[in-house]
């Protein structure tokens, strides 16, 4: 590709990195999560070095969250929630491109539902109410029995 354009300084952008993370998320490989997280970290390192166009965005994070949620790791839901917290912290610090959206929250809530700890799914659902509009999908993921408990708390 560099030869075709006579440019030897081609470098992948956020879209390229997101595609690689997405491939890992769909791979079902045992080490997919560690690879996806390493790519996310590398993107921040490259961005901090001053190279434009590689800063992770909400799509990047949601894809890493998806990779976590699809993993067979026992702590996947906890790790997904921790990554969601990182997104919220970065957003609150001024990075508007990483504001968690419906997809981000649904992935984390679904990860808790799969972990059989449905009560824990109420925590990200509550955070979601303060960050974005909720949808019926969140309540479906945490179960109808949890919906009444959630509604009575908030």
Regions found by a protein language model. Name each.
Residues 116-118, 149, 153:
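Basic polycationic patches enriched in arginine
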Residues 13-18, 22, 57-62, 66, ...:
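Pentatricopeptide repeat
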Residues 6-8, 27, 49-52, 71, ...:
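Alpha-solenoid ARM/HEAT helical repeat scaffolds used for protein-protein interactions
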Residues 1-6, 36-50, 80-94, 127-135, ...:
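Hydrophobic packing position at a conserved site in alpha-helical tandem repeat units
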């Amino acid at each position: 590709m560099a030869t075709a354009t006579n440019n030897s300084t081609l470098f992948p952008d956020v879209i390229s990195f997101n595609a690689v993370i997405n491939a890992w998320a769909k791979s079902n490989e045992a080490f997919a999560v560690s690879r996806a997280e390493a790519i996310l970290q590398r993107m921040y390192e490259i961005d901090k070095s001053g190279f434009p166009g590689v800063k992770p965005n909400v799509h990047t994070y949601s894809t890493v969250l998806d990779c976590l949620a699809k993993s067979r790791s026992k702590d996947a839901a906890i790790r997904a929630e921790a990554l969601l917290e990182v997104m919220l912290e970065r957003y609150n610090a001024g990075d508007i491109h990483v504001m968690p959206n419906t997809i981000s929250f649904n992935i984390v809530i679904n990860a808790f539902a799969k972990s059989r700890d449905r009560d824990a799914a109420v925590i990200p659902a509550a955070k979601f109410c303060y960050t974005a509009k909720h949808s019926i999908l969140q309540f479906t993921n945490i179960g109808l029995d949890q919906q009444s408990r959630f509604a009575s708390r908030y």
